[in-house]
Amino acid sequence: CKIPRWDLGKFHGVDKELGSSMKSVGEVMAIGRTFEEAIQKGLRMIGQGMHGFVENKELVIADLDKALREPTDKRIFVISKAFRAGYTVDQVHELTKIDCWFLEKLMNIMDTSRELHSFMADGELPMIPVDLLRKAKVQGFSDFQIARALGLEQAMDGEEAILAVRNFRKSAGILPVVKQIDTLAAEYPAQTNYLYLTYSGTANDVRYLGDRKSIVVLGSGAYRIGSSVEFDWCGVQALNTIRQEGYRSVMINYNPETVSTDYDMCDRLYFDAVSYTHLTL
């Protein structure tokens, strides 16, 4: 799932309607085993304060129908608000002309969010069904999104809320696994160092636990105003130095435009988010 990063808010008076003219300054690429997982990961990777398709700060929109008709950089969050307000997939399709397949997948995320909201409690983590928690993680929900949906943010510090969900998730055995990307589309078996994390799996494709000969380099993410290829080149130079010193080099990044995400640049490339949850599992 590739998503452009628009920095239209930094340009005074710019038209925010999207068309054939390129207005993005960068892009991210998210990989998952479900569309729901990939789109939510991608929306977080953009790095503009959004946590996914749901559980964001509410947009103030005077006319939802008009906002749905206009293709802007915030359109996907307008769709989220419309679903929350009770719009159906068919209604949103009629206004946006977006294929119903995509809208059905986004509605799946909204339905799971509503299920989580039904367990909202005051002050402490409710005993939500493990199957629901696993379903949320498979659909790309972050620990923060789950904490916000359960109302934990209102009773405790944000970091405490995230840790409460994280600890419960780990105690239930809900952990991500490392999967290889098949660069040959199953034409024949292939072993690659092109990896990603997913909650849709039961076993790791590579062994990494106890590996003390590897050094991890964190990528700089999507290009944006003030951060471009020069920062990525620092990461590439770090990878080269690590290899020269006899260590295995590991890159974590999610920018498909960069040199550091060429999988021949390092021993293992994790095409995934650079976040606390992903770095510590």
Task: Report the location of each language-model feature.
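Conserved small/polar residues in nucleotide/adenosyl-binding loops
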Residues: 276-281
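Non-catalytic terminal/interface segments that mediate subunit docking, oligomerization
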Residues: 169-257
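Terminal amphipathic helices with adjacent charged low-complexity linkers/tails
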Residues: 33-75, 79-85, 91-128, 132-189, ...
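Glycine-rich active-site loop/lid that clamps phosphate-bearing ligands
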Residues: 1-56
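Short acidic-hydrophobic, aromatic-tinged amphipathic segments that line or gate anion-handling sites
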Residues: 269-275
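Short helix/loop capping segments that flank catalytic or ligand/cofactor-binding pockets
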Residues: 9-12, 39-40, 54, 144-145, ...
